[in-house]
UniProtKB/Swiss-Prot annotation:
Role of this protein: F(1)F(0) ATP synthase produces ATP from ADP in the presence of a proton or sodium gradient. F-type ATPases consist of two structural domains, F(1) containing the extramembraneous catalytic core and F(0) containing the membrane proton channel, linked together by a central stalk and a peripheral stalk. During catalysis, ATP synthesis in the catalytic domain of F(1) is coupled via a rotary mechanism of the central stalk subunits to proton translocation.
Keyword Ion transport recorded: yes
Any Pfam family the entry gives: ATP-synt_B
Designated gene of the protein: atpF
Assembly notes: F-type ATPases have 2 components, F(1) - the catalytic core - and F(0) - the membrane proton channel. F(1) has five subunits: alpha(3), beta(3), gamma(1), delta(1), epsilon(1). F(0) has three main subunits: a(1), b(2) and c(10-14). The alpha and beta chains form an alternating ring which encloses part of the gamma chain. F(1) is attached to F(0) by a central stalk formed by the gamma and epsilon chains, while a peripheral stalk is formed by the delta and b chains.
Compartments in which it is found: Cell membrane
UniProt name for this protein: ATP synthase subunit b
Main location per the UniProt record: membrane
GO molecular function: proton-transporting ATP synthase activity, rotational mechanism; proton-transporting ATPase activity, rotational mechanism
Membrane topology summary: Single-pass membrane protein
Signal peptide: none
Species in which this protein is naturally found: Latilactobacillus sakei subsp. sakei (strain 23K)
Record SUPFAM superfamilies: F1F0 ATP synthase subunit B, membrane domain
Amino acid sequence: MFSNLIVGASASYLGDSLFVLVVFIILVALVGKFAFGPVSKMMQERSNKITNDLDSAAQSREDAAKLAAQRATELKSSKSEAVEIVNTAKQNGEKQREGMVTLAQEEVQTLKQNAKKDIEQSRLDALNSARDDVAQLSIEIASKLIKKELSVTDQKSLINSYIEGLDKQNETR
Protein backbone atom coordinates (compact mmCIF):
# COMPACT_ATOMS: atom_id res chain seq x y z
CA MET A 1 0.00 0.00 0.00
CA PHE A 2 2.72 2.23 0.77
CA SER A 3 4.39 1.37 -2.53
CA ASN A 4 1.18 2.18 -4.41
CA LEU A 5 1.18 5.47 -2.78
CA ILE A 6 4.72 6.22 -3.93
CA VAL A 7 4.03 5.02 -7.50
CA GLY A 8 0.78 6.98 -7.58
CA ALA A 9 2.51 10.01 -6.18
CA SER A 10 5.27 9.80 -8.72
CA ALA A 11 2.77 9.54 -11.59
CA SER A 12 0.84 12.44 -10.29
CA TYR A 13 4.13 14.32 -9.76
CA LEU A 14 5.20 13.59 -13.30
CA GLY A 15 1.84 14.67 -14.69
CA ASP A 16 1.84 17.84 -12.67
CA SER A 17 5.38 18.61 -13.71
CA LEU A 18 4.52 17.99 -17.32
CA PHE A 19 1.47 20.22 -17.02
CA VAL A 20 3.48 22.98 -15.33
CA LEU A 21 6.16 22.65 -18.00
CA VAL A 22 3.62 22.99 -20.82
CA VAL A 23 1.93 25.94 -19.13
CA PHE A 24 5.34 27.52 -18.53
CA ILE A 25 6.33 27.13 -22.19
CA ILE A 26 2.98 28.58 -23.28
CA LEU A 27 3.43 31.44 -20.81
CA VAL A 28 6.97 32.10 -22.05
CA ALA A 29 5.72 32.04 -25.65
CA LEU A 30 2.88 34.44 -24.83
CA VAL A 31 5.15 36.72 -22.83
CA GLY A 32 7.72 36.56 -25.62
CA LYS A 33 5.11 37.37 -28.24
CA PHE A 34 3.15 40.06 -26.39
CA ALA A 35 5.48 41.48 -23.72
CA PHE A 36 9.03 40.89 -24.94
CA GLY A 37 8.51 42.79 -28.22
CA PRO A 38 7.16 45.97 -26.64
CA VAL A 39 9.64 45.77 -23.75
CA SER A 40 12.59 45.25 -26.07
CA LYS A 41 11.25 48.03 -28.35
CA MET A 42 10.97 50.31 -25.31
CA MET A 43 14.49 49.34 -24.21
CA GLN A 44 15.83 50.02 -27.71
CA GLU A 45 14.08 53.41 -27.80
CA ARG A 46 15.48 54.21 -24.37
CA SER A 47 18.94 53.14 -25.52
CA ASN A 48 18.59 55.33 -28.63
CA LYS A 49 17.40 58.26 -26.52
CA ILE A 50 20.34 57.91 -24.13
CA THR A 51 22.74 57.68 -27.09
CA ASN A 52 21.14 60.76 -28.67
CA ASP A 53 21.29 62.60 -25.33
CA LEU A 54 24.97 61.73 -24.95
CA ASP A 55 25.67 62.80 -28.54
CA SER A 56 23.69 65.98 -27.96
CA ALA A 57 25.60 66.66 -24.74
CA ALA A 58 28.91 66.08 -26.54
CA GLN A 59 27.79 68.41 -29.35
CA SER A 60 26.68 71.00 -26.80
CA ARG A 61 30.04 70.68 -25.04
CA GLU A 62 31.85 71.19 -28.36
CA ASP A 63 29.63 74.15 -29.20
CA ALA A 64 30.27 75.63 -25.75
CA ALA A 65 34.02 75.16 -26.21
CA LYS A 66 33.86 76.81 -29.64
CA LEU A 67 31.77 79.64 -28.23
CA ALA A 68 34.20 80.08 -25.32
CA ALA A 69 37.11 80.19 -27.77
CA GLN A 70 35.23 82.70 -29.91
CA ARG A 71 34.45 84.83 -26.85
CA ALA A 72 38.09 84.69 -25.79
CA THR A 73 39.16 85.77 -29.29
CA GLU A 74 36.60 88.57 -29.28
CA LEU A 75 37.75 89.64 -25.82
CA LYS A 76 41.37 89.78 -26.99
CA SER A 77 40.25 91.67 -30.08
CA SER A 78 38.22 94.13 -28.02
CA LYS A 79 41.16 94.62 -25.65
CA SER A 80 43.47 95.37 -28.57
CA GLU A 81 40.84 97.71 -30.03
CA ALA A 82 40.55 99.46 -26.67
CA VAL A 83 44.34 99.84 -26.49
CA GLU A 84 44.33 101.18 -30.05
CA ILE A 85 41.56 103.66 -29.21
CA VAL A 86 43.44 104.84 -26.11
CA ASN A 87 46.67 105.22 -28.09
CA THR A 88 44.85 107.14 -30.83
CA ALA A 89 43.28 109.40 -28.21
CA LYS A 90 46.70 109.99 -26.63
CA GLN A 91 48.22 110.83 -30.02
CA ASN A 92 45.35 113.19 -30.84
CA GLY A 93 45.66 114.80 -27.42
CA GLU A 94 49.42 115.23 -27.89
CA LYS A 95 48.89 116.79 -31.34
CA GLN A 96 46.24 119.09 -29.93
CA ARG A 97 48.54 120.08 -27.05
CA GLU A 98 51.39 120.79 -29.46
CA GLY A 99 49.05 122.86 -31.63
CA MET A 100 47.91 124.85 -28.62
CA VAL A 101 51.50 125.42 -27.48
CA THR A 102 52.49 126.56 -30.99
CA LEU A 103 49.48 128.87 -31.17
CA ALA A 104 50.29 130.30 -27.73
CA GLN A 105 53.91 130.90 -28.76
CA GLU A 106 52.77 132.65 -31.93
CA GLU A 107 50.41 134.82 -29.90
CA VAL A 108 53.24 135.68 -27.49
CA GLN A 109 55.49 136.66 -30.41
CA THR A 110 52.71 138.79 -31.88
CA LEU A 111 52.12 140.44 -28.51
CA LYS A 112 55.87 141.10 -28.14
CA GLN A 113 56.04 142.66 -31.60
CA ASN A 114 52.98 144.79 -30.90
CA ALA A 115 54.44 145.83 -27.55
CA LYS A 116 57.73 146.79 -29.22
CA LYS A 117 55.83 148.82 -31.82
CA ASP A 118 53.79 150.49 -29.08
CA ILE A 119 56.94 151.24 -27.08
CA GLU A 120 58.68 152.67 -30.15
CA GLN A 121 55.62 154.75 -31.00
CA SER A 122 55.39 155.98 -27.40
CA ARG A 123 59.09 156.86 -27.47
CA LEU A 124 58.65 158.76 -30.72
CA ASP A 125 55.57 160.51 -29.37
CA ALA A 126 57.47 161.40 -26.20
CA LEU A 127 60.42 162.73 -28.25
CA ASN A 128 58.11 164.77 -30.45
CA SER A 129 56.28 166.07 -27.42
CA ALA A 130 59.60 166.83 -25.75
CA ARG A 131 60.79 168.62 -28.90
CA ASP A 132 57.66 170.71 -28.94
CA ASP A 133 57.95 171.42 -25.23
CA VAL A 134 61.67 172.18 -25.48
CA ALA A 135 61.06 174.35 -28.51
CA GLN A 136 58.29 176.25 -26.79
CA LEU A 137 60.35 176.58 -23.65
CA SER A 138 63.40 177.65 -25.63
CA ILE A 139 61.42 180.23 -27.50
CA GLU A 140 59.98 181.61 -24.31
CA ILE A 141 63.40 181.74 -22.69
CA ALA A 142 65.03 183.20 -25.76
CA SER A 143 62.30 185.77 -26.21
CA LYS A 144 62.61 186.78 -22.60
CA LEU A 145 66.35 186.98 -22.89
CA ILE A 146 66.36 188.82 -26.12
CA LYS A 147 63.08 190.54 -25.62
CA LYS A 148 62.59 190.07 -29.19
CA GLU A 149 60.21 187.86 -31.14
CA LEU A 150 61.62 185.44 -33.68
CA SER A 151 59.76 184.49 -36.79
CA VAL A 152 58.16 181.04 -36.92
CA THR A 153 60.60 179.81 -39.55
CA ASP A 154 63.57 181.02 -37.55
CA GLN A 155 62.17 179.34 -34.45
CA LYS A 156 61.75 176.02 -36.21
CA SER A 157 65.22 176.01 -37.71
CA LEU A 158 66.74 176.96 -34.36
CA ILE A 159 64.82 174.16 -32.60
CA ASN A 160 65.65 171.54 -35.22
CA SER A 161 69.35 172.33 -35.05
CA TYR A 162 69.21 172.14 -31.26
CA ILE A 163 67.39 168.74 -31.34
CA GLU A 164 69.78 167.35 -33.92
CA GLY A 165 72.59 168.28 -31.62
CA LEU A 166 70.84 166.44 -28.75
CA ASP A 167 70.26 163.36 -30.97
CA LYS A 168 73.95 163.29 -31.88
CA GLN A 169 74.89 163.48 -28.22
CA ASN A 170 72.51 160.56 -27.40
CA GLU A 171 73.92 158.46 -30.25
CA THR A 172 77.52 158.90 -29.08
CA ARG A 173 76.62 157.70 -25.59
